[in-house]
Amino acid sequence: MTDNVTFTLRPLPKAAFVAGYAGLLPQVIAAAMVLSGMEYRWTGLAAAYGYAAFIFSFLGGMWWGLAVTTRNNDTAANGIFALAVAPSLLSLVTYLPWIWGWEWPGPSLAWLGIFLMLSPLGDRWLSSRCALPLGWMKLRWRLSIGLGGTTLFLAAFA
């Protein structure tokens, strides 16, 4: 049995924008800790790394959810599922230098910042394979540039 589900594209609610922008605050607080020059510098860098990695992984979870609920067809979903696990795997790869005692967190922050800033390209690709809410790309670009840019900025201070 096949269920034919039709999705009506509705604009994102204002709450999505408010919550999204509020989601930038932890990275801004981490930046303030790093730039304060106080003993919280290392804590700020580690928190900035962790938050960027969590959010990047969360993005993959959103992509997974979109693939499950709004895909155009099962064939289109295969690539979406592969895309959806990439953020978690890339976040893990950026964590490995710390485990192995290599230089960290500067390069890891830089890579995460770049990945975050480029992540809306995945959403663009996704938009041809599943339904995205109206305003999605606008919000995604703004949040990705905001979080990715702040993360990349902090990499310079690591």
Task: Give a label for each model feature.
Residues 1-12:
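Short, Lys/Arg-rich, polar N-terminal cytosolic tail immediately upstream
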Residues 33-45:
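Short, hydrophobic transmembrane alpha-helix segments
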Residues 54-55, 59, 114-125:
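Alpha-helical transmembrane segments and their membrane-interface exit regions
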Residues 122, 126-148:
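Interfacial loop-to-transmembrane junctions
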Residues 95-118:
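Transmembrane helix-loop-helix
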Residues 23-30, 81-92, 139-154:
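Small-residue-rich segments of transmembrane alpha-helices in multi-pass membrane proteins
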Residues 42-58:
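Loop-to-helix transition at the N-terminal end of transmembrane alpha-helices
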Residues 65-97:
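Helix-adjacent hinge/juxtasegments
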